[in-house]
Amino acid sequence: MLTLSDFDFPLPPELIAQSALPDRSASRLLVVERTAPEDTSEAVRLVDRAFSDILEYLNPDDLLVFNDTRVIKARFFGHKPSGGRIEVLVERVVDTHTVLAQVRASKTPVEGSLLHLADDAFAVTVGPRVDQFFTLRFPEPALDLIERYGRLPLPPYITHDPDAYDETRYQTVYARNPGAVAAPTAGLHFDDALFARLDAAGIRRAFLTLHVGAGTFQPVRTENLSEHKMHSEWYAISPELADAVRETRARGGRVIAVGTTSLRALESAAAEDGTLEAGSGDTDIFITPGYAFRIVDALITNFHLPKSTLLMLVSALAGVEAIRDAYRHAVDARYRFFSYGDAMLLTRRDRRA
């Protein structure tokens, strides 16, 4: 049985990308080509490419599925009425005036109290606890105040304060539905010029929404993976996407998820017969090796943190040994890691590229 330690790997800190490249599609692409379904080093071939070469690995019958969530400026600093400093990270917008948020303070805020945010620009009212989150009531529409006064919530491994460059580059060019507190980073490699090339090649694309939560950075704290409690995120699948997946299957094409968030939404909405069901809801799907994929055939993704649930997910798709070899190669070849880093193209173990 696999344990948490099986998903650890040494990563030199200088390989953690601290800023985005000037050109979105100028990143590198590690293609993990599968030659046989066995989970062995001999069953895969690792190919170093540029991300702009990705069209060479796509077919006209394929469908790329993107997550169109938009990152909100979810981080606030402020103080309690007593003067004690606080930090607020919005996790989810519940309705027009209400959010769920993490609140860091020396003492737990009291229900009914006020938290003064953004240099006293406004105050929110503390409501009931929901698991580890606080309900906060905003005096005006929450998304308006978040956009006006909040700060971009860069991942914890990016060490600089967010600036105007990050506000553009930590956002996909197709982001349109605000609600995420972390970017669907595989999509950061796509720009309008690359989309034009995809269109010219007849590669179809479709969109879903999954609002990425801060739980995506939550560490796994137990060696026994079955004891890990996965975070929950809201997603929506349109009837148009469900139709596109069905048409792709009928034509013999592949469903290629752009990012692990797209994959998690697709697999969460999969029926037992392998069809995709339109609708919306929350998902806490935890994909580990042994999972039987129903929708996704291939995945474009960045490199993930050691011991993370996302490293387990890509291992489930491509094979544990294949991912170990790929990550070892990526470190040796000095690939850039994590949100602003380079990308991989992975194919399901039971599929051929």
Curated annotation (Swiss-Prot):
Recorded GO MF terms: S-adenosylmethionine:tRNA ribosyltransferase-isomerase activity
Superkingdom of origin: Bacteria
Pathway: tRNA modification; tRNA-queuosine biosynthesis
GO CC terms of this entry: cytoplasm
Keyword line: Cytoplasm, Queuosine biosynthesis, S-adenosyl-L-methionine, Transferase
Locations listed in the record: Cytoplasm
Known catalytic reactions: 7-aminomethyl-7-carbaguanosine(34) in tRNA + S-adenosyl-L-methionine = epoxyqueuosine(34) in tRNA + adenine + L-methionine + 2 H(+)
SUPFAM superfamilies hit by this protein: QueA-like
HAMAP family: QueA
Functional note: Transfers and isomerizes the ribose moiety from AdoMet to the 7-aminomethyl group of 7-deazaguanine (preQ1-tRNA) to give epoxyqueuosine (oQ-tRNA).
UniProt record similarity statement: Belongs to the QueA family.
Protein name (Swiss-Prot/TrEMBL): S-adenosylmethionine:tRNA ribosyltransferase-isomerase
Source species of the chain: Cupriavidus metallidurans (strain ATCC 43123 / DSM 2839 / NBRC 102507 / CH34) (Ralstonia metallidurans)
Name of the encoding gene: queA
